[in-house]
Amino acid sequence: MRIALFFSAMLVCLGAVAAPNEPATLDRSTWPEQLISPALFDVASRAEILAFAHALLVSETLDESALKQRLGLKTINLDTIDNLRKRMWQRLLANYNLAQQSCDQDASFCYYVDGMDSLREQAGKFEIADDSFYVAWAEPSREFHQRYLDEQLRKAALFPQISSEIELFGEQESNGEAMHDRLFSLTFDSGPSQLPGTTDWLTDYLRKQSMSATFFVLGNSAQVRLDKSGTQALQALYKGQCVGVQGWEYRSHSHWQDWQDSILRTTALVKQVIPNNYVALFRPPYGQRRADSGGFFQAQGLQVSLWDIDAQDMSASLSAEQSAQRVLSLMLLWRHGVIAFHDTQDKVRTALPWLLKATAQSGLGWEDCEVL
């Protein structure tokens, strides 16, 4: 019976990971202005907020049957979906108010919003005229926000049977929603890469940029690097960076019988080999963890570190630049947060420099990894 339940759960998890549509991305060349000032960042931010708010408002007109069909699911958790929508509306309102602070410098997409009712009203009638300066962006943006919203609604619909970053289980968990405006944190999963590899390039690149990130390592991958190159090389690899843990293998920790041992073994290895870089953070692969795991993490002094901006760089359907463009669009929408890349993906060699160049003059801040 236990084996049957295990395989049943794994089939459900695999179905959740494989979303029915390709990940959403938005060609940023359709936006006619470069983000060369904080005010121009705000213009683009206001536009993305209104476009997403419009998509969110439209989704609320769907009844349960229509929503199931749209998400490609037979059963959905309406309560979690409703909670997600409420949180999204609250964040959209806060973000729009922040983005409007520069309206005296550029009034594009500045509308009267003094609360939730007026935001919903503006979202309902939001459209781009055919002769607008921004018309080339209008349809690609509409498609992006609908697809991105569906990604999020689908995760909420499956929660908590299939856990993900869409919802927190308790105080031992965090994501990027509480960060300050215009502040972002870089995180990288599933490393270190094989030697030599993307992790080596990435940590060197970050040091040259005087930046730091949190790397969530797999115990087996770290052990391979340790066996091949030794302790000093592993310490040099992560110099100036932070290292959290992601378990011994990149697999779901929600239905794995040895999930606790996976975390304990990896934590012990990292503390022993690179103690000066260790931070007490666990990043669950796929965002999947047990609903009752809070006590374990508290006892171990670990925080579950989730994210709210996903690069989707493991998707074969997205190029490196498309992954970076997705991240930038979500940075404009959410205005702060934890960005999740994978340092085992070669795409990051192109995606990260593109992202940093595109935002270099936009007044953003990058959180020091030790603050995460």
Identify what each model region corresponds to.
Residues 2-186, 197, 204-213, 335-372:
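Terminal accessory/targeting
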Residues 20-47, 291, 296-334:
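Active-site-adjacent pocket scaffolds in enzyme catalytic domains
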Residues 51, 83, 87, 94, ...:
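Charged/polar, solvent-exposed surface patches and flexible loops
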Residues 116, 120-122, 128, 132-136, ...:
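Metal-dependent polysaccharide deacetylase catalytic core of the NodB/CE4 family, i.e.
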Residues 144, 232-233, 322, 326:
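Exposed alpha-helical structural elements
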Residues 160-177, 197, 253-271, 325-327:
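Short, composition-biased local secondary-structure segments
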Residues 189-190:
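Alpha-helical, coiled-coil/dimerization segments enriched in small aliphatic residues
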Residues 267-269, 329-330, 364, 372:
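Short, intrinsically disordered/low-complexity patches at protein termini
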